């Protein structure tokens, strides 16, 4: 395929003057005509020669080309944290310098290695990334390359000409080596525009060709037939086969500075210029005199540079205006960006005179050349789970803003302003103190105690006219790090210093609050507003395959004296998080998690009632189950926290099966869900159903389902309060409840299907005689992993448990008891129909343990397989389970995926977290270890992984069983972090 394409392209160049000399001609009079046979022979011979020359060139070029495997390990400025591959090529074999793109080197922390053509691997560090132009340099140690002679490509920017045949040699589409052919079609196009809030090159010409390069080819050399690098592959069009190459003029200058150990000076007047053709310049006011002079001086040029964007408060602000046509600098006529760069870079700190034409008039202005490096951020702050840096020239240029302000490069943690917009925010003030720059921001954050709520004023770069004000929760316990990272171009590492330890939280004070009654003529219904509250959770660490996020819902206060609140487990999925209860939309109080039901989707949290001076009312809870057709009063909170109510009736009570997620995570199982006839309940993520006397009959809860198209599917259903009464009563008595369950999934089948499966007629008659709600049999839909020999099987039809006919799902919901009863398990006698025969089984119940320990290694979160994993798998490997991996971590770079089980490290079995920690703590920094794993489908495989403890230290979070608090401990870290 490649050869055919190259042949076609080469045939277009067979008419060059060099080839004409080799052709044979037959003369007819004064006319010179080429015979058909000679034409074919000449083209064929030229094609062979051209092909052989390219083959010889490519064989040398590939020895200089490297595949770059890298990670930009933290979000910084406009660059996200990511893991990717690209291309580079050696430009100095003695110093070990590799040229690639700036968007590969990145503006922030970089970790990577390169692979040479002979598959030798070598670590690289970044030594330079240009503030504007899309190039950067990596450095490797040439002494570590032992099995091949390092070949460097010579840079020849002057050889990039229109019509030149070129090859792009690189790591196209992630392949080890691809060779793409093309012809240079333009050498004077403006820099491509990649969109807002991302890196863009500007103030330079770009070279255009059609080579159809794709992802992974960034940083590839563009070579001519003589093997010289004439340009640098930088980007391409998504809608055509067009590629964009960066000229090498300024790259060559930067390389010479590095080779001479001299600083690479970069000057700026904070103005963006665009190359515009003469016809457009004339419309902007270019006079015929200047046009004729420029055309005479620069016959190959098609236009002049025109001012596009002038940054406020920059050196040219108020002097140069948009639409000004650049005529000369210091009296030197200008036609290219290269001339501008050369003058500015040589005059940092000096005054330079610019001659521009505005409306047909020549205007001379003097600007002091600024230092481009000084307005390019080289440090960032990490605090409260978010990262910040000074607003950069890159970001400010797009919106013509002054280069100042605190730029939120990762909207997460306490500063997660908008789940949909993660980049582009400017923090104007925190806790009523202005934050004009990063240093001021750091000083403000030093003074704020942990778990405080402070006011933040901020705005988005794309909307300067709409300031935002919100209150945020300061998290310095889950996200305890407060660090300043600074770039070190000598080592390639971003060194960090710890700024300040967390300030202890301030003691809470009690507050008063007033409840607004529910609009109702029934006083018993109206006062139920005093029994409802808001609940929100802040999860900073993703565990149990659940995201780190903030969730909000409502809850029912089931005991005002002790502060118990029942809430959907959708909002309280586990206990590695912070919980808050808001009373009367006025008082926010921290709460503790007292109970998580393993199947029925509810949690119970507890707040300190001494902090609430408000008439909170404990509601009456029903002692009887709801039935189909019953009337009820629905009271619920809408998504915007408005309390609404309406009369309704129960339309159905049936077993439901919530779809499982692709990656197993908590979901409700074995439910008898209540459906109601109401047009307002779909608008409420929490509510209650009551009798007319205010007795609570059921809860209206949100249930987490599967993830579809990157969105969470949430189901809304009712849960009878009777399903919660035993747990509530145990908590009210001052004890801790425990639930023992038969760990299997159940569903329902009709009498017809039960008969087909072999259920005897006598049992069908019993069901018809005793069932009052729905004629159904309960069947086993799936069986969780267990090491017990006696167990249910999928397809079993449940007849009875302990000699009692099973007619409804709640009979299989588990056994609830107080924790002080010390019951390891119960044995239940099941009678089932299996394969058409009645079978008696003595089944042990199990207690579902919540996650109480996690290990963070190489950027992935490891834990014991949680309950959802055991529900989904029939055979669980002996290893630690990966539940999450960081977006720029070694785990992603080397191939650890969520749902993988790590069974061995360096051939040592790791059956549990303690053994895993024992093994990995012996692995030195920046070394490879062998990891054997098992996929979710029990397919074994192995990888090698290189540790990086500077950016990804090993840590453990473990729950103290006595206090209920999570304790963090870091291991083998390159720097100690005070706790």
UniProtKB/Swiss-Prot annotation:
Pfam families xref list: PDZ_1, PDZ_6, Trypsin_2
Domain of life: Eukaryota
Renumbered residue ranges of the record's region Serine protease: 65-255
PDZ domain segment(s): 273-361, 750-836
Compartment(s) where it occurs, according to its Swiss-Prot or TrEMBL record: Nucleus
Record's keyword terms, sorted: Apoptosis, Hydrolase, Nucleus, Protease, Repeat, Serine protease
Main location: nucleus
Enzyme class: hydrolase
Record-level Gene Ontology MF annotations: serine-type endopeptidase activity
Function per UniProt: Nuclear serine protease which mediates apoptosis.
Annotated family: Belongs to the peptidase S1C family.
Entry protein name: Pro-apoptotic serine protease NMA111
Gene: NMA111
